[in-house]
UniProtKB/Swiss-Prot annotation:
Reaction catalysis annotation: (S)-2,3,4,5-tetrahydrodipicolinate + NAD(+) + H2O = (2S,4S)-4-hydroxy-2,3,4,5-tetrahydrodipicolinate + NADH + H(+); (S)-2,3,4,5-tetrahydrodipicolinate + NADP(+) + H2O = (2S,4S)-4-hydroxy-2,3,4,5-tetrahydrodipicolinate + NADPH + H(+)
Organism name: Bradyrhizobium sp. (strain BTAi1 / ATCC BAA-1182)
Similarity section: Belongs to the DapB family.
Listed pathway(s): Amino-acid biosynthesis; L-lysine biosynthesis via DAP pathway; (S)-tetrahydrodipicolinate from L-aspartate: step 4/4
GO cellular component, one term: cytosol
Name of the protein this chain belongs to: 4-hydroxy-tetrahydrodipicolinate reductase
Highest rank taxon of the organism: Bacteria
Length: 272
């Protein structure tokens, strides 16, 4: 069976380099292209060398249309504007689009979902097995505990992360909201500062920390009368996200058009 040919978007970034390494270690995939923003100083550089590997002959380019002609999928952990630009091309080419980009707006998500009648999209705020299991647990716990338990989500990432709360924190927040039977946007408390007044009943709170090289720490706190339940996950290496994204791509290869998440990839939808 031939290997799945994958493009890495943002191949010169930290996550992009991790994806290149994951593909190099895979028996089921090979690197078909390395995408960077047009005008980047990295254009023309060898993707393997940038990832700390031997040269592989794949040069970074800003031309997704050309490199996608012989590809089967694209792994996209970039920025919202780049991901939205990539969505149209991936759909036109009929290749699987694995999206781990965070900071997307509701309108961005609507654009992504609009192509899924004719394209394959797997999207998740976090591609790791552990976090997706955590999300399933959070939903079940939120459903099981009554409103006397307040829900707070604490996350920490490295100092270079540009969006907050993290995509993973929001994913966990949505899981908690779903368990409670509410809409997160209507029950979200962020950035408390100064005299805020008492905590509003039913809110799901978020707090974000930034510093050092933390790959991603997340805790969901259920604070009730005289007791607290804390569900946590610590990412020690961003390679867990790269391997998860690669697993998603291989799973999506040959699937019918549609919108999928890591719960589909990992078979978690019927866990509880």
């Amino acid at each position: 069976m031939s290997k799945m040919r994958l493009i890495v978007a943002g191949a010169g970034g930290r996550m992009g380099r991790a994806l290149v390494r994951a593909i190099a270690d895979s028996d089921g995939a090979e690197l078909a292209g390395a995408l960077e923003a047009p005008g980047s100083e990295l254009i023309g550089k060898d993707a393997g060398v940038l990832a700390g590997l031997p040269a592989n002959g794949i040069k970074l380019s800003g031309d997704l249309w050309t490199m996608s002609a012989e590809a089967d999928g694209i792994l996209d952990f970039t920025v919202p504007a780049a991901t939205i630009a990539n969505v149209a091309i991936a759909a036109e080419r009929g290749i699987a689009h694995i999206i781990g980009t965070t900071g997307l707006s509701a309108s961005d998500d609507a654009v992504i979902k609009s192509v899924t009648k004719r394209a394959i999209v797997v999207q998740s705020g976090n591609m790791s097995l552990g976090v997706n299991l955590l999300s399933a647990l959070v939903k079940q716990v939120a459903k099981s505990l009554d409103a006397g338990f307040d829900i707070e989500i604490l996350e920490m990432h490295h100092k270079h992360k540009v969006d907050a709360p993290s995509g993973t924190a929001l994913m966990l927040g949505r899981a908690a909201a779903e368990g409670r039977g509410v809409v997160l946007d209507q029950h979200s408390a962020r950035g408390r500062d100064g005299i805020t007044g008492e905590r509003r009943s039913g809110d799901i709170g978020f707090a974000s920390l930034r510093g050092g090289t933390a790959a991603g720490d997340h805790s969901v706190i259920f604070a009730g009368p005289s007791e607290r339940l804390v569900l946590s996950h610590q990412a020690e290496d961003r390679m867990i996200f790269a391997h998860g994204a690669l697993k998603a791509a291989l799973w999506a290869h040959g699937k019918p058009p549609g919108y999928y998440t890591m719960s589909d990839v990992l078979g978690l939808k019927d866990l509880f």
